């Protein structure tokens, strides 16, 4: 059985405060984008019960496969019941550590795919609870629609936002941004910004209304990322921002983006919302 985990961008990211548990409270609008990995899960009677054989292709994923979020997600379902042996393959298209949520999306889709394949009958609330334990933004990828995210990112509320026909240009410079470092170097705002209200304003106003408060600390250490944002605005983007903690920067265009040249080590995707 196949699934196609999708990526996301953040429209605005307000880091509100650091919590006693070490996490940060945030406020952000998470938007699905049509950039996908490919995940396949099949049963194999020759494998032992609860055995997972996991393989990967495509873009490189750091770390041991057994520590991958996909394996951790399926293992979380094994806590409730014994599962048959599974062969799992992930073809990676969404870059890791890029602010696009690829790893969290893979984990969320692994939960749903395993539930459907094996007819486990897990409720949406149960899957979201597991997802929230796997990663702060993991539960978002179970919903597949625009959401206002609060708390660590796991408190979600649907938002009405029509981006159909709009074009988004993603540029990833291949720079690894440490999320921990980005959080360590920023100053939390201390208050919510009501981003859910602000995003209802015309897109021409978003530049002033939807800040990513992680940008100053990231741009200070990685001016090449800041330069991408400037270039997108210079070429007609209605709105441009770093997604999450970076390093991907996106521009939203009313019309098809113009042809641009980028360094060879930059990954670029031009996508359109259906």
Predicted segments — roles?
Residues 13, 37-41, 137-141, 147-148, ...:
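Short beta-strand scaffold segments in enzyme catalytic cores
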């Amino acid at each position: 059985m196949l699934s196609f985990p999708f990526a996301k961008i953040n429209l605005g990211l307000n880091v509100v405060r650091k919590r006693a548990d070490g996490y940060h409270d945030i406020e952000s609008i998470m938007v699905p984008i049509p950039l996908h990995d490919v995940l396949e899960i099949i049963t194999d009677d020759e494998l032992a019960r609860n055995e997972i054989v996991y393989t990967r292709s495509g873009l490189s994923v750091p770390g041991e496969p057994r520590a991958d979020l996909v394996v951790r997600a399926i293992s979380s379902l094994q806590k409730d019941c014994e599962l048959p042996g599974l062969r799992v393959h992930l073809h990676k298209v969404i870059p890791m550590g890029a602010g696009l949520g690829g790893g969290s999306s893979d984990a969320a889709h692994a939960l749903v795919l395993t539930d459907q394949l094996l007819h486990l009958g897990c409720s949406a609330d149960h899957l979201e609870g597991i997802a929230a334990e796997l990663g702060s933004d993991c539960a978002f990828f179970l919903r597949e629609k625009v959401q206002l995210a609060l708390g660590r990112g796991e408190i979600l509320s649907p938002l009405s936002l029509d981006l159909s026909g709009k074009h988004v240009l993603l540029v990833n410079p291949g720079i690894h941004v440490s999320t921990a470092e980005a959080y360590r170097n920023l100053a939390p705002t201390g208050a919510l910004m009501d981003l859910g209200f602000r995003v209802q304003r015309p897109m021409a106003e978003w530049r002033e209304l939807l800040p990513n408060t992680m940008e100053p600390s990231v741009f200070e250490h990685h001016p090449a990322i800041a330069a991408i944002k400037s270039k997108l605005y210079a070429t007609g983007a209605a709105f441009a921002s770093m997604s999450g903690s970076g390093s991907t920067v996106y521009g939203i265009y009313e019309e098809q983006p113009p042809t641009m040249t980028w360094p060879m080590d930059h990954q670029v995707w031009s996508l359109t919302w259906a």
